[in-house]
A protein has these predicted regions:
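Structural recognition of the beta-strand scaffold that forms the well-ordered cores
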Residues: 1-5, 40-44, 75-80, 150-154, ...
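The substrate-binding groove and active-site-proximal loops of carbohydrate-active enzymes
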Residues: 2-16, 44-54, 118-134, 157-174
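Catalytic domains of carbohydrate-active enzymes, especially glycoside hydrolases
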Residues: 17-47, 143-147
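An active-site-proximal structural segment forming one wall of the substrate-binding cleft
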Residues: 26-33, 125-153
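Substrate-binding/active-site clefts of carbohydrate-active enzymes
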Residues: 52-56, 71-137
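Glycan-recognition surfaces
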Residues: 101-130, 134, 185-291
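Carbohydrate-binding surface patches
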Residues: 269-271, 275-278, 283, 321-366, ...
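C-terminal beta-strand-rich structural cap/linker in extracellular carbohydrate-active enzymes
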Residues: 386-407
Length: 407
């Protein structure tokens, strides 16, 4: 659990906002129960270069010195794109190469020697080029020297693009990707938590976590970057959790001033619950340093210890129904100590929705049984139920976490 700068501040991040967000987590959210195993990651995303060398070093030292009242420690995280270059200054010298190579040298080439066109605005770097390898060594050494414990590596698919590679033994994009990722794993040596983003699903084994979908913010619906968008990925990708990676559901975004932040506690709780059921990896990305609305929403959204306790179990839910096309299912389930947890979502921003779940869709062995109780995890209240099913009415954008108990 922790905080990420991207949706909150993007290219406006600075050391005051970075440290201020960490301080709010320490002083306000941690006492409410936010955190997992008494560790909070405070992560810089893109545009961390807004901080000069002294500011970056001082900020990292400050984060590492932070302690919550309960002993929770704080660890810094950072962001990097090892296989993508974002500038059009192709004559710039490559870091770590002692001016031996310029960026145009290390970019992936077409058979005629021209550069492979940009993808998503970035040039593809050839992982097999010695200049690219030196660049990787340079950045990883700098990150580890500063004391970063968490590394989000983004746009990794750039390293798997097809082209003519510097090393003639590398004949495919995936061979190049394997080469580049192996270097990262070898040179971090288990000393950093590696979270992969925009990365091939296979080959796996090169990171601890992998983004389940792409960027996700705080709105319940509306297409890309919504809670439903991310849960569509969980609907069809739940099986990757712990089999390939820890599933990363991206950040929880609260408040109007952040990018597509949740506009209410109800909507924010739905985004939080979507992260909880995706394995419990929760990174807030709200303007906690300087936005009173985001601070108020955060206290309301992260204020239920029972929900956070479920998140701390680090287990992923499965969809009850799996034939939903390009939409997410609205009901997810996983075993609990007393039966099963069930998470339900209303993706409609304007209308309430009643959801009815037959017991035998959850477990074929469940039949009409008066000993089954349906409990709201957040409040502990017991809900009424039918003989063969239970129904819940959700307000617009609302979600709920229930436990069916029979053990």
């Amino acid at each position: 659990m922790g905080w990420n700068s991207w949706a909150a501040y993007a290219n406006k991040i600075n050391d005051h906002r970075y440290l201020g967000s960490a301080a709010f987590m320490r002083d306000t959210l941690v006492p409410q129960g936010f955190g997992n195993r008494k560790v909070i990651y405070i992560n810089l995303d893109a545009f961390w270069s807004n901080l000069d060398a002294v500011q970056l070093s001082d900020a990292v030292a400050t984060i590492k010195a932070m302690r919550g009242a309960d002993g929770t420690r704080f660890e810094p995280g950072i962001y990097w794109t090892p296989f993508a270059y974002w500038s059009d200054n192709l004559d710039a010298y490559v870091e770590g190469t002692n001016m031996k190579y310029r960026y145009r040298d290390i970019l992936l080439k077409a058979p005629d020697g021209s550069l492979i066109p940009k993808v998503d605005g970035g040039w593809a770097i050839d992982p097999s080029h010695p200049g690219a390898k030196a660049r990787t060594t340079y950045y990883l050494q700098q990150f580890q020297k500063l004391g970063f414990q968490y590394l989000k590596i983004d746009f990794l698919s750039h390293g798997s693009l097809e082209g003519v590679h510097f090393d003639p033994a590398v004949q495919t994009g995936i061979e190049a990707y394997n080469l580049g990722m192996k270097q990262i794993v070898d040179e971090t040596g288990g000393r950093m938590f590696l979270s992969l983003s925009i990365a091939p699903l296979f080959p796996s084994g090169y990171g601890h976590a992998r983004r389940l979908s792409c960027d996700t913010k705080g709105h319940i619906s509306g297409g890309d970057q919504s809670t439903e968008y991310m849960l569509n990925s969980l609907t069809y990708g739940w099986w990757t959790s712990k089999n390939l990676y820890i599933t990363d559901p991206d950040h929880v975004v609260l408040g109007d001033k952040a990018d597509l932040g949740a506009r209410s506690v109800v909507e924010g709780k739905s985004r939080l619950l979507s992260a909880i059921i995706s394995g419990g990896m929760i990174l807030d990305s709200s303007r906690l340093a300087d936005d009173s609305q985001a601070q108020e929403l955060a206290q309301g959204v992260y204020g239920n210890r029972s929900w956070l306790s479920v998140a701390a179990e680090d287990k992923t839910f499965r969809p009850i129904e799996g034939d939903t096309g390009d939409r997410a299912t609205d009901a997810f389930v996983r075993p609990s100590a007393h039966g099963v947890y069930v998470a339900l979502f209303n993706y409609d921003e304007k209308h309430p929705q009643a959801i009815t779940i037959p017991f035998d869709r959850i477990d074929k062995t469940l039949v009409s049984d008066p000993s089954i109780s349906v409990v709201d995890v957040a409040t502990g209240a017991t809900l009424q139920q039918g003989h063969t099913d239970f129904s819940v009415k959700l307000s617009p954008s609302e979600s709920t976490l229930l436990e069916l108990r029979w053990k």
